[in-house]
Amino acid sequence: MRQVSGLILLAAGGSVLLLTGCATGKATVGGGNYHVTAYRPHDPSQVKVKLSTSTQNLFVMEGDRLLMAVQANVGKPGALTPHGHFTIYSKQKERRRASEPDRGYPMAYWCEFAPAYGFHEGFVWPVPHTHGCVRLHREAAARLFALVRVGTPVEIESSLPEDATYGRMVQRLDQSRDPDPPRSVLLSPSWFKDPPGPLLVDQ
């Protein structure tokens, strides 16, 4: 089971700005080259998380304002990520897997939206590959954790209108060939250190 960090792209407001240095968003990068910008909401009560499972695009919106747009990794066939309308009802930054296999494996920045389903840090593949949870690169997971709170609504559908308006700007990410860190690193408390720099920026 692979779980690590990543990069991202992003944009906001009336004019969408790509902040990853990739003008088209079509190039695929590995985990080491992934960096994300997320905008601080004006009204946190208006934040909503939207996930398109067919494209694996994740958008964080404040009304019509885009705060963050990144690639996620959703459930594989036979272990699909649930669709529908949910709310974040539990957050835990330093969460670890409690069952075997891989007991103790970090699931940092856990944001639970349904029983046993949540957003968390992990290796992001270009195809659905999880057991139903939604994995995000560390760069994205830390910022999602900062953007949402208990009660933040979540919408998960096979496709979303935002796929057409913002989807082309999502930087594609492929960590399927990235090596797993040593287990000693995964089990270290230092694993839960935030990525460098501010998690949210003003626009």
Range-by-range predicted roles:
Residues 1-11:
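Bacterial N-terminal signal peptides that target proteins for export
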Residues 12-15, 23-24:
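Intrinsic disorder/low-complexity segments in short proteins, especially the signal peptide
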Residues 15-16, 126:
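Residue-level signal for mature regions of secreted extracellular proteins and peptides
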Residues 22, 27-29, 80-85, 92-203:
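Exported/periplasmic cell-wall-interacting domains
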Residues 22-78, 198:
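Cell wall/extracellular polymer interaction/catalysis modules
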Residues 52-54, 73-75, 89, 114, ...:
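A structural detector for beta-sheet-dominated domains
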Residues 57-59, 87, 118:
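General beta-strand recognition
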